[in-house]
């Protein structure tokens, strides 16, 4: 029995040391959406473009748009029905099979245009997580609460909010640059920063930014981020919403 346990331990150690070799992927992607004339053109099975969409209502739509754009001649338009008690309304695109590992810093830059001034409590606009065999490993995502960007963890870690008396609301009916930078750590050595139009609105250090490896044997997580999702990743229960996204940049900075 001791020999068997030692053998298993050695195998697990070998796999852990070779994760990066086994689960390799790019750590850079950018898209200005200029080359697409339809949603179908945006998707590809070879990981050159985006990997998949989430459209959980038949009335939700994603399409290139030329009327409201940040740079160039096109952006992507996301139109979503509101969520309710029966289902979560999603209207988003995701880039999978990327590879950002513990100790690395991932930065996502994107321009957002949220149309209208209606309430959008707990509207989710950007996710980072790890794809696994079934579903996705728990990650983090940006949300609007009281019209202010916050960071929600989908694992056991406190969410990150702007100062209660000094937060900055997200402007509506105009382009807003959002930069989300995360140093990945399964321990309390991570860093989370969010900029809105060049102003630092969230700055947290000594925090956990990846789920612990306890989940690895249960769900297949490997201590990494491999999937980035933008758009209306989960709509509010308050209202139907329209959002435009342009000039997305996903990169490792160190």
Predicted regions and their residues:
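Bacterial Sec-dependent N-terminal signal peptides
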Residues: 1-24
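Low-complexity, Ser/Thr/Pro/Gly-rich disordered linker/stalk regions
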Residues: 17-177, 182-254
């Amino acid at each position: 029995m001791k020999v068997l346990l030692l053998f298993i331990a050695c195998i697990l150690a070998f796999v852990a040391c070779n994760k990066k070799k086994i689960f390799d992927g790019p750590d850079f992607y950018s898209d200005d959406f200029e080359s697409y004339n339809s949603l179908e053109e945006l998707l590809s099975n070879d990981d050159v473009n985006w990997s998949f969409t989430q459209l959980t209502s038949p009335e939700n739509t994603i399409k290139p748009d030329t009327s409201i754009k940040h740079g160039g001649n096109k952006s992507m338009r996301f139109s979503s029905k509101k969520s309710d008690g029966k289902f979560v309304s999603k209207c988003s695109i995701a880039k999978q099979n990327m590879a950002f590992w513990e100790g690395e810093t991932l930065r996502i830059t994107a321009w957002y245009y949220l149309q209208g001034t209606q309430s959008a409590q707990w509207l989710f606009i950007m996710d980072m997580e790890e794809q696994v065999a079934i579903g996705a490993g728990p990650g983090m995502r940006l949300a609007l609460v009281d019209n202010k960007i916050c960071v929600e963890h989908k694992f056991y870690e406190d969410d990150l909010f702007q100062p209660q008396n000094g937060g900055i609301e997200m402007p509506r009916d105009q382009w807003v640059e959002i930069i989300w930078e995360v140093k990945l750590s399964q321990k309390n050595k991570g860093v989370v920063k969010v900029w809105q139009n060049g102003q630092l609105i969230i700055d947290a250090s000594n925090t956990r930014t990846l789920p612990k490896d306890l989940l690895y044997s249960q769900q297949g997580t490997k201590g990494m981020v491999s999937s980035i999702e933008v758009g209306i990743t989960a709509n509010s229960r308050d209202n139907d919403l329209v959002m435009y996204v342009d000039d997305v940049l996903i990169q490792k900075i160190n």
